[in-house]
Amino acid sequence: MRSAHTVGQVRAAEGELMARLPEGTLMGRAAYGLAAVCARLLGRVYGARVLVLAGSGDNGGDALYAGALLARRGASVRALLLSPERVHTGGLAALRAAGGVVTADQAEYGTADLVLDGIVGIGGRGGLRPDAARLAGAARRGTLVAVDLPSGVDADTGEVAGAALRADVTVCFGTYKPGLLVDPGASYAGVLHLVEIGLSLPPAGLTALQDADVAALLPVPGAESDKYRRGVVGVAAGSEQYPGAAVLAVAGALRGGAGAVRYAGSAAAEVVRRHPEVLVSTGTLAAAGRVQAWVVGPGGGAGAGERLDQALAGPVPVVVDADALTELARRGPQHGGPPLVLTPHAGEAARLLTEGGEPPAAEELSAARLRTARRLAERYGAVVLLKGSTTVVAQPDGRARVNPTGTSWLATAGSGDVLAGLLGSLLAAGLSPFDAASVAAYRHGLAGRRAAAQGTPITAGEVAAHLAVVA
């Protein structure tokens, strides 16, 4: 599992460690790890052209000390000082002692084999200064390595207020930063490398599951399991206008780990034709039989409100998706009732956050994905799976997970229906709402990648089919 810590948490841990270590030890550890990554990227260090972009403070110092280490191995290292009056004097002295030189020629940015971005550290806010912003749009041929964080990206949120440097590799010290895992910041970070420097950190408020974490969470039938012990998921989806949504939601549910799927709705004939193993009914949700979780809303049309009422009247967890989200936004937060998992995209999130007047712009919410997911979770007292370029799962206490899988090809009709069904099935199989949403997003993203392996458009049905090979 990847864990990310806020700037405040990192600063506190650094302060505690520096109080126990000789002066300069912590920066030395960071610089050594940074230089080691750069050496691997260069392959041959001797004769390589390296440009250090050094801002003020410790971030620039890390870059300068790393540049000095590379210069000692024969690299031609030049430093472009973005804040000469506030440069880290120890780092600059070390670079010069190793044979590095200071340059004022920004054209070297485009010719270096490797560029170290040490302009702004994790405390930076509000975008880059004009001289640094010019570099963000300049052409370069070499590899850009960000020191702890690409300059221009907010470390805590991933927001990008203006110009930012787009890194090929980001070397993180001590822990990942939230802004490296969440778009838009994640799209500027490139490949992440973590360098341990000995920090003692509290539990992380933001994490990202990896393969082993998901494997440990997935339900595995025991020797005495039957379909009822494994859990039964109910799907209330589809309408005369959108019967395919029911078929796709059921397809996702069948791959989620529950022992059986019950369907309640007007698309019963289409569902049983495609999935004969499903138990179907056309009456109320209560008449469908006992379930351990409900999925309500995909393609529900005008009937989504009635279905939502029926699900909220019961005790089992409810996945609220699509048209049911629109109905929930109209009503506002619900107090009491069963556990909810909301699955909005940015447009639905905007409606859910509207408190009279105009809704917030979906584009603004997308640019602040972590903050948006947490606001929704707190407002509705529910786990929220905010879909998008980076899917974020948040719960009301502020803890969140970022999904590291997926592909832009998943932006296709019906993909969300498959995800909702998969999520409901994992809930019925016994996972907590937070774990079920996290695992569903992960598996859905992997299935999308597999389906799009040839780099061509995919359908939601293909995503559902590929869930079978990413269990």
Question: Model segments located where?
Answer:
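Nucleotide and nucleotide-moiety/phosphate-recognizing core
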Residues: 36-119, 127-147, 317
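Internal gly/pro-rich beta-alpha loop/helix module
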Residues: 113-114, 119-205
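Small-residue (G/A/S/T)-rich helix-start motifs and N-terminal tracts that mark the onset
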Residues: 1-79, 114, 167-169, 178-322, ...
